[in-house]
């Protein structure tokens, strides 16, 4: 177990180091580090967008809400300020493009999302948009934006969280051509469809217009996303930046266990068909299975050792919601429903875990004379980040930190992402790479979400360094 004061001490030393600057820096980093644009202005814009909310007292900005449209217009203005040609597509995605010296070449896309969860933090999604605009603004200020060998396009996706319509990646799935037309008729809690929500903002969508949003895979060379880590690893390591090797695949289940409802005082324990007890046993088994998959699953030691190591290091399982009926203190429940969220970098391993869970669940329910039903509500395959793109991002991040601190930085860590990102949708049409940015205590989807000003700077500087390789 680590010393409890080690993490804040490491973070303090790292923050102090990042406040240093040198007279000379890495060749890939501009000599003055562009603090005004890459840190001060970027941070100011993040805080400004953090005030654009549909709610009083907390941040809420869902797909096509009034605050969403206000944020989109602000982002579009900042894109114009950076010298980019801008437009909004029929799914509300905001685009800003620099043609560069060869407009017909394959384009590099840089993006993230501007929608939020309810009671959100101000950095999730927005950080990636703002640092991209800031990095391109530096190139425009220096007169080198039109010298890029490839077009570069920033995309601020309208919806990634899926809060309003319970469908994630509306924006990026439309651009990658993977959004089913049927989703346009999904309704929110007020029975408003996606089509209606867009129309209320003077945006017309149809099957034909949805097809027009899709980018041809042959026109794109790569997709880059800068995002807060949403976890504690970078803070533990005392480093502002890391690169992502892949994004975990995910399965969501809804489990319903039905038993016999009865009086809490009159039904003997041996005669009960208690769905709560069965659900509890299933949940404890799931925890043990996900903590110790190597001991719980059978596998070929020679062929599957690496896969098992990957599964063990990335597998996480969560029961986040439990609902009982009738939910009274003096009643044996008649029904218990709970959710399972299971994520891993190995898709085959994830399926093995699910198979093991289903088998044991069936046994438990039979032993306890209750009925179990399982619905698979969501499945997403793992995404592997492109090795070449990741290598370039890693070199850029290392150079940026070296330039900021003035001390040797051997390398930045290579990490797996347990959270889903727009990069998962974009991976359907192009190579993807991601840069993670440290966030305080690993907290996200919360008002407590926080990124140090200098860490915003480091991310923007790393992206600038990456873009300068195109000059």
Model-identified regions with their sequence ranges:
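Acidic/His- and Gly-rich active-site-bordering loop/insert found
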Residues: 22-32, 36-120, 139
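Active-site-adjacent substrate-binding region
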Residues: 36-39, 191-245, 283-287, 291, ...
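Alpha-helical metal-binding/catalytic segments enriched in His/Glu/Asp
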Residues: 110, 119-160, 251-257, 263, ...
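His/Asp/Glu-rich mid-to-C-terminal helical/loop segments that flank catalytic regions of hydrolases
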Residues: 245, 263-293, 354-359, 437-471
């Amino acid at each position: 177990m680590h010393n409890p004061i080690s993490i804040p001490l490491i973070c303090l030393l790292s923050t102090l180091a990042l406040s240093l600057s040198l007279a000379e820096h890495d060749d890939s980093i501009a000599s003055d580090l562009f603090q005004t644009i890459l840190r001060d202005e970027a941070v100011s814009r993040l805080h400004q967008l953090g005030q654009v909310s549909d709610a009083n007292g907390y941040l809420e900005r869902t797909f096509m809400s009034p605050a969403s449209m206000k944020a989109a217009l602000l982002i579009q203005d900042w894109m114009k300020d950076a010298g980019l040609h801008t437009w909004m597509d029929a799914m509300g995605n905001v685009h800003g493009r620099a043609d560069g010296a060869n407009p017909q070449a394959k384009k590099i896309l840089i993006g993230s999302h501007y929608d939020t969860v309810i009671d959100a933090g101000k950095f999730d999604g927005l950080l990636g948009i703002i640092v991209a605009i800031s990095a391109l603004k530096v190139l425009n200020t220096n007169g080198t934006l039109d010298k890029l060998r490839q077009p570069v396009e920033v995309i601020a996706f309208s919806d990634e969280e899926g809060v309003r319509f319970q469908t994630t990646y509306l924006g990026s799935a439309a651009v990658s051509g993977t959004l089913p037309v049927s989703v346009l008729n999904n309704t929110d809690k007020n029975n408003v469809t996606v089509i209606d929500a867009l129309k209320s903002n003077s945006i017309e969508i149809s099957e034909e217009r949805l097809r027009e949003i899709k980018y041809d895979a042959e026109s794109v060379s790569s997709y880059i996303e800068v995002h807060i880590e949403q976890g504690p690893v970078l803070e533990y390591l005392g480093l502002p930046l890391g690169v992502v090797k892949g994004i975990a695949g995910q399965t969501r289940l809804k489990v319903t266990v039905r038993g016999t409802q009865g009086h809490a005082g009159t039904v003997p324990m041996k005669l009960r068909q208690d769905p709560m007890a069965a659900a509890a046993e299933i949940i404890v088994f799931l925890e043990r299975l996900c903590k110790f998959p190597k001991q719980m699953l059978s596998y070929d030691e020679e062929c599957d050792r690496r896969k098992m190591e990957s599964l063990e290091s990335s597998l996480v399982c969560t029961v986040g919601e439990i609902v009982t009926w009738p939910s009274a203190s003096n009643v044996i429940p008649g029904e218990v429903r709970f959710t399972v969220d299971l994520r891993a970098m190995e898709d085959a391993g994830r399926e093995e875990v699910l198979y093991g869970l289903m088998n044991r669940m069936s046994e438990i329910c039979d032993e306890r004379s209750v009925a179990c039903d399982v619905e698979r509500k969501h499945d997403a395959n793992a995404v592997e980040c492109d090795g070449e793109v990741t290598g370039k991002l890693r070199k850029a991040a290392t150079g940026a930190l070296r330039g900021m601190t003035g001390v040797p930085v051997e390398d930045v860590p290579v990490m797996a992402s347990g959270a889903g990102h727009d990069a998962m949708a974009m991976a359907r049409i192009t190579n993807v790479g991601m840069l993670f940015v440290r966030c305080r205590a690993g907290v996200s989807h919360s008002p407590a979400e926080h990124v140090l000003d200098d860490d915003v700077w480091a991310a923007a500087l790393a992206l600038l360094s990456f873009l300068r390789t195109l000059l």
